[in-house]
Amino acid sequence: MFITYLMKEADVADLIDTTEMYLKTILELEEDGVTPLRARIVDRLGHSGPTVSQTVARMERDGLLHVMGDRRLELTDTGRARATEVLRKHRLAERLLLDVIGMDWAQVHDEACRWEHVMSDTVEARLIELLKDPSVDPYGNPMPGMGGGVAHSAELAVRSLEVGALTIERIGEPIQADAELLAAFDELGLRPGARVGLSAHGNVVRVAALDEAGDVSGYLTIPMALAAHLFVSGQ
């Protein structure tokens, strides 16, 4: 099976807590090695520049972040603690939805975006116990406070001319946010732990699923910008 995917804008209109959404986005940008800027929030969430600037200014007044001289957004201790809490609840919700409820892998991210804002600390603690303190979410991303393995983006791998079989370690938020793309990944077995081959073709990256013999069983192509959020290792 061969799939070509074109990037589309994220649909975040139904998320219910803008402050928490921005805090989580900043933390995710840091996690992906991307400098947190207002422009990056515009890219991630699809909000207008003026809306993002107004929200960031309010968050700075509330003591959740600082806008540095180089325009970088730096979370305060209070902001980081709250961002970590929201991200942890989000990833616990994803594990619950997949492992216990049995929701489709491609759908759990969108649903967890709603749960993260309404989950109480009591429920969070019970989920940690119920799920046996999971170390990663369904897309290979570590629970906040837990270190992850050494991995780099598929974009970096192809730009550095890395060849041979690679392993998907984790899938970043911009890919998770599109259920259609995730479904295409899932159909080809492209989950964390899957063996893949990568190749650049202009401004897109071909991600080839490899079978046990190392042969290509199918592939999809994604924009280079999205490949930056597919993290792989040589293991």
Give the residues covered by each predicted segment.
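A short, conserved structural fragment
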Residues: E60-D70
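Short, intrinsically disordered or compositionally biased N-terminal tails of bacterial proteins
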Residues: M1-V12
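Basic, amphipathic "hinge/linker" alpha-helix immediately C-terminal to the N-terminal HTH DNA-binding motif
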Residues: R71-H90
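Short acidic, hydrophobic short linear motifs in intrinsically disordered regions
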Residues: D32-V42
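Basic amphipathic alpha-helical segments that dock to polyanions
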Residues: Y22, I41, V52-D62, F185, ...
